């Protein structure tokens, strides 16, 4: 039976009845199909001039929606954090809040994948976005009334909700694309997500360009709060995973949650049966270890507010470039997935050594004691030698994106199942946050800059070495799993090709 005849038979079948029926396909026999009257509109691709838009129910569209949620929530949060000290002169309060944030994030994040499987991606993402506006509101409040308790509460609440947001985000980004497109989807997400930080960085840069004030204004905080609230609401417009269609015409695979007890049991079973995933934990742990150093001990310590804002803009723009470079290589079909995984490991390792080696030359110029002295002059972008510092910060941003894109790609290469990837992503963000919590506390305790710098370099290199057995032994040419056995759709979408609109 041809696909054209199949489309005609489907239209006849649903013309008089909207009940779910069984439709035959050439390869798989009967598959359950959705009634046209209930679902057809989300698979249409309306024309805009000469071009067809993406179907609303396509995996790419849903990935873009998730990316815009992260653009507005953690993207704006990153823009604020990148200024150092949450935009304030004194980083101690923001550091304490971040310790609370990442400690709670680490605790809940380990179970966030199970929560996502239980209540669904859409609701998990929406709830997860609410913490960002609350946290930013607490910083605005502190600026006027010095309510330290509210800032700590804001950090705790954000830690609880952010774990949920990132578990849902990871499940979508890693399970919605086809295997050969996973790095491209990661790059699309990373580009849009960090565009939020880029645009968010322009606002304080514009406000402080001709100002001698060393902290951001009320308008900046208020703008961030509004945008973050909009981002949380945007998540409610997503299509459920089971109604989302991949590029090959298959539904995204997701199993219905069986309740809290079985979700927690599944979490334990994952660690027991796939014990080798523990070798990836140091990589997860170190993936944000360096950000406190870069934001507080590099950017905040050495530069004035307008230069920090400019550095922030360059850093997040470099992240977009870094993720694009990673995607070009990791999805390069000239080499199979095993080769890309192994060569990628070597390239990331070399980049870490080269870039952090350059950072050592900069770090030797100052200490925590020297920047605290009254005669220390913070650097402005008009000062001689600033260009070299700017390029170092750009390379730091690119390396962050490349390292995390590679980590995402490795996780996504281990499975195609949304539920399992949500659990993996919970592990990733939990351990990442545990590392961040420790580093913010280390910064509050005023450990020497050089000690912190050395720990960053050592952890990044060491974590790759520990992860190498998984990369060498567990990354296969393709991932065999339940998802790969799901029959294609027979509801007017292509049986063995890309998504086709039901109606023009």
Curated annotation (Swiss-Prot):
Gene3D superfamilies on file: MFS general substrate transporter like domains (1.20.1250.20)
Membrane association type: Multi-pass membrane protein
Species of provenance: Schizosaccharomyces pombe (strain 972 / ATCC 24843)
InterPro entries to which the protein is assigned, alphabetical: MFS, MFS_trans_sf, UNC-93-like_regulator
Entry keyword Transmembrane: yes
Protein name: UNC93-like protein C922.05c
Keywords, comma-separated and alphabetical: Cytoplasm, Membrane, Transmembrane, Transmembrane helix
Pfam name, any one: MFS_1
PANTHER family: ET TRANSLATION PRODUCT-RELATED, UNC93-LIKE PROTEIN C922.05C
Compartments where found: Cytoplasm; Membrane
CDD domains in UniProt: MFS_unc93-like (cd06178)
Main localization of the protein described in the UniProt heading: cytoplasm
Family, similarity comment: Belongs to the unc-93 family.
């Amino acid at each position: 039976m041809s696909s054209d005849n199949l489309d005609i038979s489907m239209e006849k079948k649903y013309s008089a009845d909207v009940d779910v029926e069984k439709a035959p396909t050439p390869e798989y026999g009967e598959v359950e199909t959705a009634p046209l009257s209930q679902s057809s509109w989300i698979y249409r691709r309306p024309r805009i001039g000469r071009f067809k838009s993406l179907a609303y129910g396509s995996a790419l569209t849903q990935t873009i929606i998730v990316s815009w949620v992260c653009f507005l929530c953690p993207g704006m949060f990153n823009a604020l954090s990148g200024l150092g000290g949450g935009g304030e002169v004194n980083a101690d309060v923001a550091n304490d809040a971040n310790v609370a944030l990442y400690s709670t994030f680490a605790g809940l994040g380990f179970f966030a994948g199970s929560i996502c499987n239980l209540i669904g991606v859409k609701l998990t993402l929406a709830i997860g976005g609410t913490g960002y506006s609350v946290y930013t509101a607490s910083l605005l409040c502190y600026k006027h009334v010095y309510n330290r308790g509210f800032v700590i509460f804001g950090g705790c609440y954000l830690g609880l909700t952010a774990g949920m947001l990132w578990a849902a985000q990871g499940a979508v980004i890693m399970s919605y694309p086809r295997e050969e497109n996973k790095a491209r989807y990661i790059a699309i997400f990373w580009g849009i997500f960090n565009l939020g930080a880029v645009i968010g960085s322009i606002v304080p840069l514009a406000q402080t360009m001709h100002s001698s004030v060393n902290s951001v204004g009320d308008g900046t905080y208020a703008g961030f709060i509004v945008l973050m609230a909009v981002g949380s609401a945007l998540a409610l417009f997503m299509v459920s995973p089971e109604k989302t269609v991949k590029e090959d015409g298959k539904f995204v695979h997701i199993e219905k949650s069986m309740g809290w007890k079985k979700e927690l049991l599944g979490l334990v079973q994952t660690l027991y049966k796939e014990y080798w995933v523990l070798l990836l934990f140091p990589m997860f742990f170190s993936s944000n270890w360096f950000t406190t150093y870069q934001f507080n001990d590099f950017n905040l310590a050495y530069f004035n507010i307008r230069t920090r804002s400019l550095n922030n803009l360059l850093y997040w723009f470099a992240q977009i470039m870094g993720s694009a470079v990673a995607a070009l290589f990791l999805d390069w079909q000239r080499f199979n997935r095993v080769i890309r995984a192994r060569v990628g490991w070597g390239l990331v390792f070399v980049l870490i050594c080269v870039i952090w080696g350059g950072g050592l030359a900069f770090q030797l110029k100052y200490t925590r004691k020297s920047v605290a002295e009254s005669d220390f002059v913070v650097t402005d972008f008009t000062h001689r030698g600033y260009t070299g510092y700017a390029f170092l910060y750009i390379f730091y941003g690119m390396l962050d994106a490349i390292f995390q894109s590679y980590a995402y790609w490795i996780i996504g290469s281990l499975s195609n199942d949304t539920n399992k990837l949500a659990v993996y992503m919970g592990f990733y963000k939990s351990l990442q946050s545990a590392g961040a919590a420790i580093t913010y506390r280390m910064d509050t305790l005023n450990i020497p800059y050089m000690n912190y710098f050395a720990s960053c370099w050592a952890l990044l290199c060491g974590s790759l070495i520990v992860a190498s057995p998984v990369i060498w032994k567990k990354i296969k040419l393709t991932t065999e799993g339940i998802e790969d056995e799901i029959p294609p759709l027979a509801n007017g979408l292509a049986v063995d090709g890309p998504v086709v609109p039901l109606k023009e």
